[in-house]
């Protein structure tokens, strides 16, 4: 049924149980409400309700609408009904055809006494195909459903109507019996009244006589006063005499306490509701008074005192603190941010902390001490408000000096609150901690992103005039930071103390660009600017000991700026997150160096530049940055030992990878060493040419390492290369199992190995390397003796020693 549509109606005589003399031609759907109720116009009236039960005020008839059957049923008071239908009536021709349809079932068959159901079914389906059997079963199912529908309409429905009518008749009989009894009682009462005789003289009033009343007992006067208490309360409340009104309430409570029976009676007396209503009005009035921001301290105290006397402690506390929070929010909205962050934070702190101080004084003067926990919770909520403003206004800056100044402003107010007896500094630090930690983490992410961009453009060319010191203009720093360090720690937050540096490197001081307009600059841009300034200033710096690539110089710049910035806001509680951030930065960089040195296209100079970078980070930069944070807090970084060990393992891996690569290059390219040369029988020249070439190549490599890295790295790298060369030679002999040395080849091999052991002795080569050399000599001697039928005697030890001593002497004289 759609809104605004009129449906034409006709009476359905088949379903109607009563005829109607009036034929209503249509029904109109006026409106459909949101709750599912319909408004329809029918019988010149408006009907309201759900479709299954709609009523109107002008008649007792009820109607129901069936949208599926398209019928409107009018139920009268006598349970009879008139049914109207819109749309088409059921087709009578189809009904007659259904009656006349061919019925394959002979019902007389089931009446026979000899009826056998199994035989009947077998005979019925024996000559039928599957399709015919399916059609027959469908026919039986349709007949079954039709039978059920007829039962519902013709039997069960009439049965329910009959049961309902029987109940109505029974109820009517009971009502008639009650009515008859009432009539009988009324007749008896009237008869008794008519038989009463009254002596009217007895009831005549004597004019001269006075009626004496017994005076009220003092004990009953308070009870009598209760009847006037609501009026007195109303007058006091309207005249704003709240003290008097509260006194009346207390008087009522005393009457209840002294007269328990009165309290019991008042539980069901209307007077109690009147009194409670007046007390509620009084309480609401006092609550509204307490919400007013214009109240003075003594007025607040008096109002709260009245509410406490009314046993409204919790409500008074809640409303008092809520009103103070509202006034603080209104005051904050009036603060105008003109661009000066410190001024804005100072005004914000003044408003909030002054309100907290006055609220604490009013609260302690008005409420009992056991309710102070609610005050503490409220103070923490206000501190949360400040921390949220900090997160939105302060921690979005990149100027850490401005951030530290803003934090110091709040801390100074907390210190003033401590002097008044309210210690809230701990709560403030607790609320600020997550925001500062997130600030450090964001700083770390920016550093790692900037470092990655720098590494993508790295050519691995060491800068020859880099000496570990970055120039800065200390004049750009505030005077308080040049000597005293951070505002928070009171210590040397920016320290040049390098007592832990074994190489006597000077710690670079980064220009922090602390100016009033630096707060909105992007940190990545600041890093690039500082890095470019450092490169430009290198022309005036003396020759340094290490050559660093541009990415390491960049890392040195940004990591020291990170230390200077964080030292301005650092506390001991921030040590864990700082340790984690530093560890992530250094591990990422060293891991990148480790992966980069494995690339085959890098030249020898580029590989040494990578080693130089790793040496600088492991031996100098990490310890220098850790010392700076230790000077600022007095505490060491949590993971310094583990971080140093991990970074050193990265450094060793970088050095070993280079040594392995260089050893293979020397064996294949410089020495041109081949194991087949040792198969000759004739004696060779007693001159170990390949290993003399190796010795000279190692000397040149040592000079290159000293030039491109430092002196300290020469011996570890050279010794590692020698060990790798010995391993390569041993592995190649093992892979060539059928190799048999000739007499001359064996003599030459022994000479080369002894010469290799001689010049390897000036390097800190592992003992296992010398053992491997002796093992190879011994094994090949045994193989020669076992595979030669008439072996020649080998040269003595003195023979090889004299040749090697002569070669060493000639090299020393030549050099």
From Swiss-Prot:
InterPro entries: Cullin_repeat-like_dom_sf, Exo84, Exo84_C, Exo84_C_1, Exo84_C_2
Region (Disordered): 479-511
Biased composition (Low complexity): 494-511
Major site of localization recorded for this protein: cytoplasm
Domain of life: Eukaryota
Organism expressing this protein natively: Dictyostelium discoideum
Compartments where found: Cytoplasm; Cytoplasm, Perinuclear region; Cell projection
Protein function: Component of the exocyst complex involved in the docking of exocytic vesicles with fusion sites on the plasma membrane.
Self-association and partners: The exocyst complex is composed of sec3/exoc1, sec5/exoc2, sec6/exoc3, sec8/exoc4, sec10/exoc5, sec15/exoc6, exo70/exoc7 and exo84/exoc8.
Highest classification ranks of the organism: Eukaryota, Amoebozoa, Evosea, Eumycetozoa, Dictyostelia
Family per similarity comment: Belongs to the EXO84 family.
GO biological process terms, semicolon-separated: exocytosis; Golgi to plasma membrane transport; protein localization; protein transport
GO cellular component: cell projection; exocyst; perinuclear region of cytoplasm
Protein name in UniProt: Exocyst complex component 8
One of the Pfam families matching this protein, by short name: Exo84_C
Keyword vocabulary terms for this entry: Cell projection, Cytoplasm, Exocytosis, Protein transport, Transport
Name of the gene: exoc8
């Amino acid at each position: 049924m759609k809104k605004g549509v009129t449906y034409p109606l006709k009476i359905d005589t088949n379903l109607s149980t009563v005829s109607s003399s009036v034929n209503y031609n249509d029904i109109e759907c006026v409106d459909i409400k949101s709750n599912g109720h319909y408004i329809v116009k029918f019988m010149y009236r408006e009907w309201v309700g759900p479709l299954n039960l709609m009523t109107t005020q002008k008649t007792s008839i009820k109607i129901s609408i069936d949208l599926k059957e398209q019928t409107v049923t009018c139920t009268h008071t006598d349970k009879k009904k008139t049914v109207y239908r819109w749309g088409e009536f059921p087709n009578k021709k189809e009904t007659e055809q259904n009656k006349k349809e061919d019925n394959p079932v002979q019902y007389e068959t089931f009446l026979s006494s000899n009826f056998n159901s199994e035989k009947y079914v077998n005979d019925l389906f024996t000559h039928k195909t599957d399709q015919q059997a399916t059609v027959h079963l469908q026919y039986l199912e349709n007949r079954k459903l039709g039978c059920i529908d007829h039962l519902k309409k013709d039997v069960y429905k009439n049965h329910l109507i009959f049961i309902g009518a029987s109940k109505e008749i029974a109820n009517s009989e009971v009502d008639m019996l009650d009515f008859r009894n009432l009539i009988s009682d009324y007749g008896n009462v009237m008869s008794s009244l008519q038989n009463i005789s009254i002596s009217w003289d007895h009831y005549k009033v004597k004019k001269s006589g006075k009626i004496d009343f017994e005076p009220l007992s003092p004990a009953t006067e308070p009870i009598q006063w209760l009847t006037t208490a609501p009026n007195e309360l109303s007058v006091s409340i309207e005249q704003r005499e709240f003290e008097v009104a509260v006194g009346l309430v207390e008087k009522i409570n005393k009457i209840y306490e002294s007269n328990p029976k009165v309290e019991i009676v008042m539980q069901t007396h209307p007077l109690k509701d009147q009194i409670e209503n007046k007390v509620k009005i009084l309480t609401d009035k006092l609550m509204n008074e307490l919400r007013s921001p214009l109240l003075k301290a003594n007025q607040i105290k008096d109002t709260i005192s009245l509410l406490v006397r009314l046993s409204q402690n919790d409500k008074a506390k809640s409303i008092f603190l809520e009103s103070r929070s509202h006034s603080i929010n209104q005051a904050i909205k009036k603060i105008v941010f003109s661009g000066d962050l410190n001024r804005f934070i100072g005004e914000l702190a003044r408003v909030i902390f002054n309100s907290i101080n006055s609220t604490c004084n009013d609260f302690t003067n008005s409420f009992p001490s056991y309710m102070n926990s609610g005050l503490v919770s409220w103070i923490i909520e206000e501190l949360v408000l400040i921390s949220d403003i900090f997160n939105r206004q302060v921690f979005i800056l990149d100027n850490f000096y401005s951030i530290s100044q803003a934090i110091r402003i709040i801390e100074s107010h907390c210190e003033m609150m401590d002097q008044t007896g309210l210690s809230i500094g701990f709560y403030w630090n607790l609320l600020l901690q997550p925001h500062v930690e997130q600030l450090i983490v964001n700083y770390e992410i920016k550093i790692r992103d900037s470092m990655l961009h720098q590494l993508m453009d790295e050519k691995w060319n060491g800068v020859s005039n880099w000496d570990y010191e970055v120039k800065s203009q200390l004049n750009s720093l505030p005077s308080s930071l040049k000597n005293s360090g951070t505002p928070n720690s009171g210590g040397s937050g920016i320290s040049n103390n390098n007592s832990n540096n074994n190489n006597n490197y000077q710690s670079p001081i980064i220009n922090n660009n602390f100016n009033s307009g630096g707060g909105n600059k992007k940190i990545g841009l600041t890093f690039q600017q500082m890095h470019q300034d450092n490169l430009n200033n290198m022309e005036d710096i003396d020759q340094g000991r290490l050559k660093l690539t541009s990415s390491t110089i960049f890392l040195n710049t940004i990591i020291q700026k990170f230390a200077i910035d964080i030292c301005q806001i650092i506390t001991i509680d921030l040590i864990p997150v700082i340790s984690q951030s530093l560890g992530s930065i250094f591990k990422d960089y060293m891991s990148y160096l480790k992966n980069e040195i494995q690339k085959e296209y890098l030249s020898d100079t580029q590989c040494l530049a990578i080693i130089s970078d790793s040496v600088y980070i492991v031996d100098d930069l990490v310890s220098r940055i850790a010392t700076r944070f230790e000077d600022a807090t007095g505490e060491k970084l949590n993971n310094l030992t583990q971080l140093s060990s991990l970074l050193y393992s990265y450094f060793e891996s970088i050095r070993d990878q280079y040594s392995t690569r260089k050893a293979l290059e020397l064996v294949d390219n410089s020495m041109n060493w081949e194991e087949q040369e040792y198969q000759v029988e004739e004696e060779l020249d007693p001159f170990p040419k390949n290993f003399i070439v190796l010795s000279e190549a190692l000397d040149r490599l040592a000079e290159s390492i000293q030039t491109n890295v430092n002196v300290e790295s020469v011996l570890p790298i050279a010794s590692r290369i020698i060990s790798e060369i010995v391993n390569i030679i041993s592995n190649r002999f093992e892979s060539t199992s059928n190799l048999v040395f000739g007499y001359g080849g064996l003599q030459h091999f022994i000479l080369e190995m002894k010469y290799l052991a001689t010049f390897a002795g000036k390097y800190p080569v592992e003992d296992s390397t010398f053992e491997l050399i002796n093992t190879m000599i011994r094994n090949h001697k045994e193989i020669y003796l076992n595979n030669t039928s008439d072996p020649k005697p080998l040269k003595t030890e003195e023979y090889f020693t004299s040749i090697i001593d002569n070669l060493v002497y000639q090299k020393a004289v030549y050099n």
